[in-house]
Amino acid sequence: MHPEVSEQQADGATEPSLEESAGDHSGAGPGVRKEEINETKETCVGPSTTSCQSQKQQSGDSRLECRSGYARNDRDDRGPRMTKEFLQKLCKQHKLYITPALNDTLYLHFKGFDRIENLEEYTGLRCLWLECNGIQRIENLQAQSELRCLFLQVNLLHKIENLEPLQKLDALNLSNNYIKTIENLSCLPVLNTLQMAHNRLETVADIQHLGECLRLCVLDLSHNMLSDPEILSVLESMPCLRVLNLMGNPVTKHIPNYRRTVTVRLKQLTYLDDRPVFPKDRACAEAWARGGYAAEKEERLQWESREHKKITDSLEALAMIKRRAEERKKARDKGETPLPDSEESSSTSPEAQEKPPLGETQEKIELFVKGSFKAKDELFPEKPGGEEELAVVADRTVEEPDLSGSLAQSQIPLVATAEESTSSVAATDGARTEDTEAIALETKERLFIDDLPDLEDVDGMDISIEDQTKETGIPKIQVVSSLSDDSDPELNDSSLPMLEHTPTGSTGILSNIFAVCKDSSKAARVPLTDICKPTATTEVETQGQVFSTTRPQPLIQELGEDGRGENEPNQSLPAQSSEDGDSQLPEATPLGDRAENEAQSSLDLGEPSPRASLEDIEFGLD
């Protein structure tokens, strides 16, 4: 029932057997028996244990190898690779062409790639960005024959290789890698820029290959381990080297007067480390190489004096230009023509002969000043006499308003409506200026009826009209009268629109009717004017009788219908109130009769009859 008891019994059963066996060997001593037992144990245990231990070690090594192999495969599978799908997706992300050959730039930086691959279709690349990856080798760039820029900084490169297909490569950046030797760059015929900062370069032999790069202009060797001053001999063998950066290397401390020495030995250098090499710095460095610090100081003073002189010369040139411009301006203000450049140069030549020669700088200043004036003359050509013409035009514009004002004032006592009544004469006289029209309008607005003369001054006004027309000599009114028997009373009414603003009332009407133009070219040709002239003096005395005896019957009947037949003779008179100064023409005829009489008068103008000429003596003066 109990397993422990059974185990004890089994042990007890085995022990007697051992005792029996020991009893069989009772002839031997106890020590011999112990040794024999130990030997048997060793023979039984020794080989088996060693074989087992070796098997265990082998199995452990195999397990470690299997685990490391699995880890490597997993790492290779987990890392990103340059697959075609990934590259197309990347091109789409950066808004590049899906067609690989059309892309000239490919951005593959910060992607974690460990090798370059699958770029065979990208044959048109000119710039390839592969920085900040895990690339360990330069490879698979055979299709990039048009590549100009290759950026491989911050990778795991140990060697420069496989760059032979890149025959057009211009810039190569291999900074922040583990490169120990510069090599395999002579196959790049147009390589211009090489950046090798933060690498493992140490000796002169590591950079000896740079002497074969004949087109290399920009070289960055900063933050390496270069310590031998003999590297300058390698750099001197580079004919096109312009920019050099050696900061962060021990060699900068091992070369005495580092900057001066490098500047003197590298003749074509224009930029060293963190600042440019100016011509002044190069001259001072060369003077230091010839005569030490004293020569350098003297050379520096000479350069400073030259720079100061150049500044003063430029200021003097500007002052000379300003002075000559002021002289020209004064000459133009005085009305004198400015001297040409040849005379100015001849005038300045005696002064130049008196003064000691200043050298080429003074000649350059003179040439610069002359060139500036020539350019100004070409851009802004000056017209001789232009100011005089402007003055003449200004005088004319000043005189014309005065003349127009005087003419307008002289026309005031004549007839104010000259422009309205004589359109044909105005057309032949020519178009007037806007100033004269404005002044004439102002004078028209200033006319008042109270200022008009009385009817008793008929003879005096006629004389003044003739005198004024002789003085001015410009005809203002051309009279066209139709001496017909039907237009007797309506003649004044038809001429009313022209004469409603006349200053002389009815006498003015008579004077305007028989006014003859003094100009021979514009004289009015009116038939029977000689017959009508004697009656002009007696018109005032017989005017009432003419209207009372010769008034047509239809007019009297029409006015009588309105209830004003008794006062019709008084109303039909032109203007009887001379004392009040209101000389208004009568408007007794209706509009219909006025239109008929105007039409009849226009017909009678063409063919005057002898009967009309006889009756004109009595009725034409109305």
From Swiss-Prot:
GO terms for biological process: axoneme assembly; cilium assembly. LRR repeats lie at residues 101-123, 124-145, 146-167, 168-189, 190-211, 215-236. SUPFAM superfamilies: Outer arm dynein light chain 1. Keywords: Cell projection, Cilium, Leucine-rich repeat, Phosphoprotein, Repeat. Residues 32-42, 62-80, 326-336 have a biased composition (Basic and acidic residues). The keyword Repeat applies. This is Dynein axonemal assembly factor 1. Cilium-specific protein required for the stability of the ciliary architecture. Plays a role in cytoplasmic preassembly of dynein arms. Involved in regulation of microtubule-based cilia and actin-based brush border microvilli. Residues 1-11, 535-552, 568-578 have a biased composition (Polar residues). The modification Phosphoserine is found at S349, S464, S487. The keyword Repeat applies. Residues 249-288 form the LRRCT domain. GO terms for cellular component: axoneme. Belongs to the DNAAF1 family.
